[in-house]
Amino acid sequence: MEINDLLLDGLENLQRMIQKGTGGLTPAELKWQPRPDAESIGLLFFHIVRVEDMATHDIQGKKPLWVAEQWYQKLNMPADAGMGHLTPAQIAAFELPKEWQTYAAAVRNSTVNYLKGLKSKDFDRDVVVPPPPGQPAKPAGSAPPPPLPFTPTVGGILIHMLTALSARGGKIDYIRGRQGHG
């Protein structure tokens, strides 16, 4: 099995987990929070897709589809939606847009096409990780940023992405269970 096939299989498993976790839920259940400062299933699903979009396009040196294809406008949301730390009020107010699945499908299609084109040597390529949206780059001569929680290579970023998305998928299952859905 090639590395990209392993990642594609992991993303397919994650997609099944998310479909099971979000399937059949009402808008109120997607918005339900186990605590006032906890993310809802809808917000977790939102983050999963946005993180995949950013990570896979950052390593290609491209803008995420969210910006490049103006999904933020299509979904009537700010360009920086879902980035950074949200206040409890922002978390409580979040509602997953009705057309979210269309954006999620576009992101996954883009990811699959990118991964299918990678060769084993491509995973070792170093990547300059841009600062998070809304955070300026460090000026020359300033203290170095804290170490990244992953190796800044194509492979390191993709593995970190898959791990982070899987953790959010587990949270979705937990919240679904808290609402009485198996």
For each predicted feature, which ranges?
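N-terminal export signals and maturation junctions of secreted/periplasmic proteins
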Residues: M1-L8
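Helix N-terminus capping/helix-initiation residues
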Residues: E2, L86-T87, P152-T153
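Short, contiguous alpha-helical
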Residues: L8-E12, Q19, E29-M83, V112, ...
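A structural signal for long alpha-helical coiled-coils and helix-turn connectors
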Residues: T22, T26, K116-K119, R176
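Short, charged N-terminal helix-start/capping segments
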Residues: P27-E39, T87-K98
